């Protein structure tokens, strides 16, 4: 059995039930973490040990979780975080880096309030720049000190109906016809995690990220994801003759298939390569008995992407990120207008950088982004 590393209680908080202690655990070493995930309906792949281990291997983040459960007791709740120590973006706790969402694994509102109170004290004592949480629901009821900093759109497709019904809910012109076009054009499909599949996927990802004028994530990140998730991760490639035209990375967790990364060669987009990959993913998920296809988050200003996902018949919901700061008052509010000039300058530089340079920049920068 792996060694369990316990630290002193992170904090003591006053609540209606008296003084309560909040503890720190290592979710990668404490076997109670997997037991908590198995019992929690809110657990997702972003809570999993595989995701945490990939973050640790790639970026060197220290993973921890806050809980009101004492050592030796069953784990009743948990809030996982990664510690990011960056000279570029500051010292902060994030739950969790590069995750679309990460709901607090807490059933009782009182426990959540106590945990958030302890986090506020931690933020003040240790002078974290901020503590960020990415729940599926609002945290306003847990504390008056949390502030919303960014809003996204999340899409999820219900896979419980039969395939014919699911297909019938796709937008006729934008989705159904594109899938049929891909079939008529003779696009072929390949899946796996072999070296050739990996390299074709990464090449498509780099091309796409450059088109969007942002660096790609490091190669090592995708290799570690594949290693940590094993057979639950699939890379899917659409081919036109001898040319890879679209790629997608999906991860299966429990009854959900999650679309996490994708890329395409723009000169072949009219052939419907990405549409073919989405459709094959849905078919595979149905065959495996999965119930949900998580299409991931979209930025608020990505109107085209939001429309695209909605046309698959996916349900749309609001996703809000929250932060605590040492003062409890000031917070780095997400405001696109404030950062416009920085974003514009950076994207201009990225658009001119050769693919090799852009890839190197991604390897350097993503550790600081979190």
Predicted regions and their residues:
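Short intrinsically disordered coil segments
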Residues: 96, 169-176, 335-341
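A conserved beta-strand-loop-helix scaffold within acyl/acetyltransferase catalytic domains
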Residues: 4-7, 14-73, 78-90, 135-270, ...
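Active-site/acyl-donor-binding loops of N-acyltransferases
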Residues: 2-17, 65, 83, 142-166, ...
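A generic structural micro-environment signature
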Residues: 31, 43, 61, 87, ...
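Low-complexity, flexible helical/coil segments
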Residues: 59-61, 81, 101-106, 113-118, ...
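Glycine-rich loops and low-complexity Gly/Arg-rich segments
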Residues: 47-49, 92, 102-107, 129-130, ...
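Acyl-donor binding region in acyl/amide transferases
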Residues: 83-151, 171, 254-317
């Amino acid at each position: 059995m792996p060694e369990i590393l316990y630290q002193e209680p992170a904090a003591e908080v006053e609540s209606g039930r008296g003084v309560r202690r909040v503890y720190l655990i290592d979710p990668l070493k404490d076997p109670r973490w997997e037991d908590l995930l198995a019992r929690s309906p809110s657990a997702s792949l972003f809570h999993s040990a595989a995701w945490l281990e990939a973050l640790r291997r790639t970026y060197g983040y220290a993973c921890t979780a806050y809980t009101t459960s004492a050592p030796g007791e069953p784990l009743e709740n948990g809030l996982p975080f990664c510690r990011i120590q960056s000279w570029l973006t500051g010292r902060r706790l994030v739950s969790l880096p590069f995750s679309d969402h990460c709901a607090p694994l807490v059933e009782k509102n009182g426990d959540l309030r106590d945990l958030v109170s302890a986090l506020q004290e931690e933020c003040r004592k240790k002078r974290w720049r901020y503590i960020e949480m990415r729940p599926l629901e609002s945290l306003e009821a847990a504390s008056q000190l949390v502030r919303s900093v960014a809003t996204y759109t999340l899409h999820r497709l219900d896979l419980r109906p039969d395939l014919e019904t699911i297909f019938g809910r796709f937008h006729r012109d934008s989705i159904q016809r594109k899938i049929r076009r891909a079939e008529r054009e003779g696009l072929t499909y390949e899946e796996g995690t072999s070296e050739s599949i990996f390299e074709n996927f990464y090449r498509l990802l780099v091309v796409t990220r450059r088109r969007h004028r942002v660096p790609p994530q490091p190669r090592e990140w995708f290799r570690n994801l594949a290693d940590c998730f094993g057979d639950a991760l699939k890379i899917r490639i659409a081919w036109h003759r001898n040319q890879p035209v679209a790629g997608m990375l999906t991860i299966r967790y429990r009854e959900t298939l999650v679309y996490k990364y994708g890329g395409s060669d723009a000169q072949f987009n009219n052939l419907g390569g990405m549409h073919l990959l989405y459709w094959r993913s849905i078919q595979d998920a149905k065959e495996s008995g999965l119930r949900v296809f998580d299409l991931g988050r979209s930025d608020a200003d990505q109107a085209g992407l939001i429309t695209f996902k909605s046309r698959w018949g996916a349900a749309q919901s609001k996703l809000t990120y929250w932060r605590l700061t040492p003062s409890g008052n000031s917070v780095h509010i997400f405001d696109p207008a404030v950062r416009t000039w920085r974003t514009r300058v950076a994207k201009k530089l990225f658009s001119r950088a050769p693919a090799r340079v852009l890839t190197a920049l991604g390897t350097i920068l993503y550790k600081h982004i979190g």
